[in-house]
Structure formats: C-alpha cells, structure tokens
Amino acid sequence: MTRHIYTDTFFDYINQSARASAQPLIGYLYPKLRPTSVLDLGSGRGVWLQEWQRKGVADVLGVDGDYVDQDTLAVERDAFLAADLTQTLNLGRRFDLAQSLEVGEHLPRAASEMLVSSLTAASDRVLFSAAVPGQGGEHHINEQPLAFWQELFAARGYRPFDCVRPVLRSNRKVAPWYRYNSILYVNEEGRAGLPDDIMRSEVPEGTPVKEGGDLVWRLRRAVVSHLPRQTVTQIAQVRAGILAKRAALQSAGPQQSA
C-alpha cells in the first residue's frame, strides 16, 4: 500500500477544528479526571495537548508520524515522539489519561488492535474517538461502528463510559466527530476515583455503544457512504484547503490593520 502523506494544509485545517473542540471538551473532563499526565496518540501538531497544558497538565506527550513538521508543533519538541502508529508502542511508562481522537480511521484495519493495545498499555483511562462509516474525510481507510472499537477495548478489560457526548452534543463549537464519537474507556483500576456522574454513564455490559448524531449528521453519512473513497478524500482536501486559508486570513486580518 502507498503511504499517505498528510500535508501542512491538512494539519492547518485539523488545528482549527481541534482547538475549538478541545477547549469545551477538556473544560468538561479536566475537573472530573484531574489528570497530571496525558498521552495523545495521533497528536498531529499537539493542539489538544497544548489545551491540556493550559489547564495545568505539565506532563504531556504526543505521538504521530514523521510527516509532522516539528517546527510547527504547539508543544515543546521534547513532548513529541515520531513513531509508526500501526505498530504497538511500548513507551515504558504510564499516564493518568491516554487519548486518541479521530485517528483510527486513518490506519489500516489490521492496525486497529495495535492502536488499542498501545493506548491500554499506557493508561487505565482512555479517551477515544474514531470516524464512523460514512463520516468521510481525508484518507479514511478504516471507518468503523463505535461498537467495533468497544469490542477491542472490552477484550483488554476496558468498559465504555458515555459521559462526553450527552454534555457536548448540542455545542456547535465542537466539531461533530468529537461530539458524536467520543467515549471514555476505563479498566478496573481506573474506576477508582471516578465521579458519580461519570460512573452513572457506564454503558451496560452486552450493550453496544450507539451511534450518535442529529438528522443532518445521519443524512451526511448516508450520502458520503455511497461515494468512492478517493472522491471523498479529494473533497476533504479541497474543503480543508478552503477552511485553512479562511482561518489564516482571519488571523492575519487584525495584524494587517494594526
């Protein structure tokens, strides 16, 4: 298989939606979990980690491919590790929280277990989201139902807690893929100290995690699911380019007029 290279335009676009989404999501989770260390697998430039840092989490590590330009990192260089996410990672340490947000769909299906193994090897608590079928995006080669990932975590003793989606599903500042796909997975050790409201959000054993989304989201998925993958990638690349340029112009505007 030809290796897909993610361009600066891709990461410019990702940064835009990631930062706007990270602030309310982390604003909700941080006081609930109070992590002192966070790992992000598929971190890109580290925008999510920078938002964790702004909440006071000093110990962060982002892991992504060597295609990430380290001159553009949002975190310190020593807080980033270039690695192959299709292989199981052994970082030799544990974190209070590991996360992987909208990454699994970019990896081959055969690497799904490796990703989950890497996350569960690193923490008792994992914040996870990945694109569902029909979501669409650049190089989405592994869109899966949420229950697919649920089964992989269950095989490692991690239970799903659906605490994030009910809180954020109406917050349009958060990109829909984070609003509708984010699940907290926790093993037996990680349950200790969880607040009562998160404990009440545990998905009953034997119950699949339900797909999220409003009518517009479901219609979008229905349409996109019938398009060829290459067409979806091309559409996503054009859209990312337009939105990235728009964001750059908006941020440059005040500076030019000053």
Question: Locations of the language-model features?
Answer:
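Conserved beta-strand signature within the Rossmann-like core of class I S-adenosyl-L-methionine
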Residues: 123-133
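A short His-aromatic
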Residues: 106-107
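Hydrophobic adenine-recognition pocket in adenosine-nucleotide-binding enzymes
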Residues: 103
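Conserved N-terminal segment of class I S-adenosyl-L-methionine
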Residues: 1-99, 110-122, 136, 142-148, ...
